[in-house]
From Swiss-Prot:
This is Ribosomal large subunit pseudouridine synthase C. Pfam families: PseudoU_synth_2 (PF00849), S4 (PF01479). GO terms for biological process: enzyme-directed rRNA pseudouridine synthesis. Belongs to the pseudouridine synthase RluA family. The keyword RNA-binding applies. One of its GO terms (molecular function) is pseudouridine synthase activity. InterPro entries: PsdUridine_synth_cat_dom_sf, PsdUridine_synth_RluA-like_CS, PsdUridine_synth_RluC/D, PsdUridine_synth_RsuA/RluA, RluA_PseudoU_synthase, S4_RNA-bd, S4_RNA-bd_sf. PANTHER family: MITOCHONDRIAL RNA PSEUDOURIDINE SYNTHASE, RIBOSOMAL LARGE SUBUNIT PSEUDOURIDINE SYNTHASE C.
Amino acid sequence: MTTPASPTTGVQLLDVPPELAGQRIDNFLIARLKGAPKTLIYRILRKGEVRVNKGRIKPDYRLQAGDQVRVPPLRLAERDEPAPLAQGLLERMEAAIVYEDKALIVVNKPAGIAVHGGSGVSAGVIEVFRQLRPDAKDIELVHRLDRDTSGLLMIAKKRSMLRHLHEALRGEKIVDKRYHALVRGHWPAGKKNVRAPLLKNNLRSGERMVEVNVEGKDALTEFRVLRRFGDFATLVEARPITGRTHQIRVHAKHAGHAIAGDPKYGDEDFSREIRELGGKRLFLHAAQLRVPLPDGQVLELEAPVDEMWQRSLERLND
């Protein structure tokens, strides 16, 4: 008995309609190429096999209305519909919603849940909400949070909302995002900001590491002391003025006050002491969000920390 060959597509030419202007090429292809694994899509993007208007593009290229996307022949696996996600995960994320309207969802993302699947993660927040909201055909992440960071995460249900919020985020002063972080040592009250350029490196393993480097992109984070635990630790508010990868984590380390529970940029001795108090997580939480909506209203939200965070701070205070 022979195994039937996987179906192969021919060259595909895809026109970009006005309502998809601003969408990243990878998300466009994931939505259009049903049955194509994400690994295949990212591979053809990296190799430059996808062309837009007959030219090569980067994997993070944002489409313009009227673009023509050329996709090379692909061998696709025979695939059934995605397996239903665990009911417990669906219920947990439904309960995490702090705001929802016709075009936007905001959740208080738990620590430990990735925003999207891939790299060994079967499903993340976006896959969950595509299953929870099957009628929202254009559902996309507005921005990202690291897997181990908790807090407010925006998900657009309409392309128009996604474009509006991306424009607002690029405006720097228009969207106000504030994080809480538990850091090592005594953060000086006079240290109001950290400005240091950040350079992103992709390791062979696929892991991303960021370092302060003069060749990096300008990055600014404002800090404010919220609470002290002697000279051992400080709870700070961090407001990233720029939006670089791992910005708050690297700026805190650069200032000499690493965030508790940070496996990449943290202080292992400090993190171990916090773990002994029951704090087995990264102590970085997107606590507050202020964002303009298309109708001129301003959405202001706050998200509480989880019980593990609360208990750890109570024990620190004893």
